[in-house]
């Protein structure tokens, strides 16, 4: 998994790319949590994510809960079909704010 962050106006976009599985969740978690400290509006772009397992989904849930605690806006942006199917299967498509 690769990632990069980009500041666009008042929001930070975290771009995740590749596979988010148990071996790669630490990097995903760190990049998202760092962004929560720096901005009130965070978008996690999942357009280029080809695979996500339960540990990757857990990172997203933890980030959403942390954003709620910090009263910050947290969005999943343009989730790939692979990500969206996992979110729907777990009924998490209604838990997250999803932006296309």
State each model region's role.
Residues 4-29:
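STAS-typified acidic loop motif
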Residues 22-95:
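Amphipathic alpha-helical interaction surfaces in cytosolic regulatory modules
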Residues 97-100:
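Short acidic-hydrophobic, aromatic-tinged amphipathic segments that line or gate anion-handling sites
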């Amino acid at each position: 998994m690769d990632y990069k962050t980009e500041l666009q106006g008042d929001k930070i976009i975290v771009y995740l790319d590749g596979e988010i599985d148990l071996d790669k969740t630490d990097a995903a978690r760190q990049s998202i949590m760092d962004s929560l400290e720096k901005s009130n509006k965070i978008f996690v772009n999942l357009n280029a994510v080809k695979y996500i397992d339960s540990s990757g989904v857990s990172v997203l849930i933890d980030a959403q809960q942390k954003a709620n605690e910090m009263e910050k806006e947290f969005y999943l942006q343009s989730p790939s079909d692979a990500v969206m199917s996992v979110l729907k299967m777990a009924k998490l498509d209604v838990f997250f704010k999803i932006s296309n």
